[in-house]
């Protein structure tokens, strides 16, 4: 059975594993998910990620990041643009998450960018998710 929204599936798996204090979470691999994982790592939300061959296809494994007392580094994740309702933002209207404390992930003509990177480049695009 095909998945209608693989990004929402990724974010839901990440949210559930984070809530349960798991150290890692695995999911089917795609280039888009790898780029999202790159952004999450560069912004300090996850410790790292790895791609491994599975019986069918490849598996993306994210290593979650916790503080010294096992407090979560990810407080919340929200999928914004969905297959049934796409959400786009112009370069002048790029949303800020929690006044700049969180990150908006955008799909632009320059690839996947954070809200700050997109504003700096002056490009808009589809708002995929908010992470804080």
UniProtKB/Swiss-Prot annotation:
GO terms for molecular function: rRNA binding; structural constituent of ribosome. The keyword RNA-binding applies. GO terms for biological process: translation. SUPFAM superfamilies: Ribosomal protein S8 (SSF56047). Keywords: Ribonucleoprotein, Ribosomal protein, RNA-binding, rRNA-binding. The keyword DNA repair does not apply. GO terms for cellular component: ribonucleoprotein complex; ribosome. It holds the Pfam family Ribosomal_S8. InterPro entries: Ribosomal_uS8, Ribosomal_uS8_CS, Ribosomal_uS8_sf. Belongs to the universal ribosomal protein uS8 family. One of the primary rRNA binding proteins, it binds directly to 16S rRNA central domain where it helps coordinate assembly of the platform of the 30S subunit. NCBIfam families: PRK00136.1. HAMAP family: Ribosomal_uS8_B. Part of the 30S ribosomal subunit. Contacts proteins S5 and S12. This is Small ribosomal subunit protein uS8. The lineage of its organism: Bacteria, Bacillati, Actinomycetota, Actinomycetes, Micrococcales.
């Amino acid at each position: 059975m095909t998945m209608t929204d693989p990004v929402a599936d990724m974010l839901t798996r990440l949210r559930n594993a984070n809530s349960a204090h798991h150290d890692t979470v695995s999911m089917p691999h795609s280039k888009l998910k790898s780029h999202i994982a790159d952004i999450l790592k560069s912004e300090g939300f996850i410790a790292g990620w790895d791609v491994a061959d599975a019986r069918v296809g490849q598996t993306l494994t994210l290593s979650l990041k916790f503080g010294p007392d096992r407090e979560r580094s990810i407080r919340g994740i929200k999928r914004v643009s969905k297959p049934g309702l796409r959400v786009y933002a112009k370069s002048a209207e790029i949303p800020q998450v929690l006044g700049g404390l969180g990150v908006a992930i955008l799909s632009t003509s320059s690839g996947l960018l954070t809200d700050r990177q997109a504003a700096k480049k002056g490009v808009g695009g589809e708002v995929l998710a908010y992470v804080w």
